[in-house]
Swiss-Prot record:
GO terms for biological process: neuropeptide signaling pathway. This is CAPA-Pyrokinin. Signal peptide: none annotated. It is found in: Secreted. GO terms for cellular component: extracellular region. It comes from Karoophasma botterkloofense (Gladiator). InterPro entries: Pyrokinin_CS. GO terms for molecular function: neuropeptide hormone activity. Keywords: Amidation, Neuropeptide, Secreted.
Length: 15
């Protein structure tokens, strides 16, 4: 988790 795809990234549905 990190505001991204749920893997601690920053790229995904929560861009």
């Amino acid at each position: 988790s990190g505001g991204g795809d749920g893997s601690g990234m920053w790229f995904g549905p929560r861009l």
